[in-house]
UniProtKB/Swiss-Prot annotation:
Organism: Gallus gallus (Chicken)
Keyword tags: Cell membrane, Cytoplasm, Endoplasmic reticulum, Endosome, Golgi apparatus, Lysosome, Membrane, Mitochondrion, Mitochondrion outer membrane, Nucleus
Protein name: Target of rapamycin complex 2 subunit MAPKAP1
Biological role stated in the UniProt entry: Component of the mechanistic target of rapamycin complex 2 (mTORC2), which transduces signals from growth factors to pathways involved in proliferation, cytoskeletal organization, lipogenesis and anabolic output. In response to growth factors, mTORC2 phosphorylates and activates AGC protein kinase family members, including AKT (AKT1, AKT2 and AKT3), PKC (PRKCA, PRKCB and PRKCE) and SGK1. In contrast to mTORC1, mTORC2 is nutrient-insensitive.
Gene from which this protein is expressed: MAPKAP1
Higher taxonomy: Eukaryota, Metazoa, Chordata, Craniata, Vertebrata
Activity control: Phosphatidylinositol 3,4,5-trisphosphate (PI(3,4,5)P3) promotes MTOR activation by relieving MAPKAP1/SIN1-mediated inhibition of MTOR that takes place in absence of PI(3,4,5)P3.
Pfam families with a match to the protein in the record: CRIM (PF16978), RBD_SIN1 (PF25322), SIN1 (PF05422), SIN1_PH (PF16979)
Annotated CRIM domain residues: 139-267
Amino acid sequence: MAFLDNPTIILAHIRQSHVTSDDTGMCEMVLIDHDVDLEKFNPSSTYGDSASETQGSNGETQGYVYSQSVDITSSWDFGIRRRSNTAQRLERLRKERQNQIKCKNVQWKDRNTSYSAEELSSLFEKKNFRVRSPCSGKQSILSVRLEQCPLQLNNPFNEYSKFDGKGHVGTTATKKIDVYLPLHANQDKLQPMTVVTIANAKVHDLIGLICWQYTSEGREPKLNDNVSAYCLHIAEDDGEVDTDFPPLDSNEPIHKFGFSTLALVEKYSSPGLAAKQSLFVRINAAHGFSLIQVDSMKVTMKDILQKALKRRKGSQRGSGPQYRLEKQSEPNVPVDLDCTLESQSTLEFCLVRENSSRGEEISEEDPQIDIATVQDMLSSHHYKSFKVSMIHRLRFTTDVQLGISGDKVEIDPVTNQKASTKFWIKQKPISIDSELLCACDLVEEKSPSHAIFKLTYLSNHDYKHLYFESDAATVNEIVLKVNYILESRASTARAEYFAQKQRKLNRRTSFSFQKEKKSGQQ
């Protein structure tokens, strides 16, 4: 053991002792004292004479020189040491193995046969690259493809190609639609063109995509460069355009409509053609009526009958019961199917089954339908939302948004952050298909600011009723809109609902009649 009073030597001894034992390097960070190092270069000025000052300075400087370890540096790079020989050797072996994988060893073998000088020269023939061979005139694959598809370069609808969903199937929501093109008037049977579009595209974008694909495939006749000249209509599976409904709104997203078959129709701006589009023929039947749109008064009654039978659910051409047309004002007088509509002097007819007759009480008193009523009926299938209050049991109400379209009725709760929902019923969203709707009736109308209506629909083989309240104007508009939709559709659920309602009424009437009969006998 040695007694030392020089802190510099003690610090150097501690540093050198921990070099080989401290793997973390923490001792180097803890024992680095910058204040001690500064005192070596700035000795105190309290020494008496210069000799002692010089001697002390030399001694401290010498102690500072020997106090620093070779492996320790007073910097932020402490703890960094050189790699060991084993690690360097392993790294070198790893690189050699990687280089051996890239190299291929070929074993030299003496040839068994002798080759002539000409054969040896042909193996490694010297080529003169300065002399270029004449161009053979062979076109590249890109040039051939550009010549085969000249229309793609001059396609005026290229801006709508970004809505093509064929390259996004599986990654983005897409929608596959069969589009009929009635522009081919000379073809007997139309073939649809399958278009795949992204789901967030609008109807206007879909029209542009259809025109782009039509032009890219080189179809004839050529289309108008203006996309606004076309519109999309609902079409049947055989390609017949359903003109009873207006075209799809060009500003609405395509995923809002559930139709898988559409038709691209050119708009008509001529006043004469516009008048033709407003020409409707009313066909009365046993359970409602249908509106058949015709192009002109020159159409034959046979065509009108075929359209009416096709509109009627379950009636197919060549099978099932046969029907005839009669004027609404002339019962039991069949109409000549070879005559034109212009010769009938009326736009209202009645569809009657063969070997049957309609009673005299059938509605000769029905008012003539005007064009305003037709427009209201056609616009009833457009989507529109209303803010109403849904009535629960115990007269609790919940604010909901009632969305009505020709396909379904949606009931979405309106979130109100200010109102406390602790003691109130939490309404869930409800979606009702139009095929399941049965009735929409006005329950009460107490004042212009308060009215209640009832919506009846089929759910799990049971009829459910929903009650709503709002102002009288909104309620009347909702009831009229829903009833227009119900009248234009041949719903099985609605027919069963009214049949069941009639049976209950008959049983009630029969029971009351028997009760009165027994009381009279007594």
